[in-house]
Amino acid sequence: MVKRVISCLLVIGLLLFAALSAKADEGEPFKMYTTAYHHGEITASGVPVRRGICAVKREWMGLTAIVYEYKPDGSMGDMIGIWECLDTGFGGDADGDGVGSIESGKVIDMYFPTLEECRDWMEQTGGKVYVQLVDAEG
């Protein structure tokens, strides 16, 4: 129960920030909030959860997310990693419009096997990243 509360608090804390404008022009990096999850067994795409999978808005499913650090001055830093967009989710509804933060494309939610790794991710990124979406199939 405590782990679930901590996970929820991490998400809520991020949603209190002003929304970053996220436009998903494929191939162009853009700013996003990031969260992390460690629960569940099967993704929205039907594959088992595993390291290297992220949850995004449904329209981005099947794409690949190349994630870069968000530097303190707001500029884009080094590449952090590559994730497959194979899951989706709702995320918190910060503005009350009935559309969650993941669903709206404001947040990318990374899967990690443990709560500790989720916390490490949040500490490493500060909850903000740059994301480049590419169609890397084939």
Locate the predicted segments by residue.
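Bacterial N-terminal signal peptides
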Residues: 8-17
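Bacterial Sec-dependent signal peptides at the C-terminal "C-region" and cleavage site
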Residues: 17-26
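Compositionally biased regions
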Residues: 8-9, 22, 46
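Solvent-exposed, well-ordered loop and adjacent helix/strand elements within mature globular domains
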Residues: 25-138
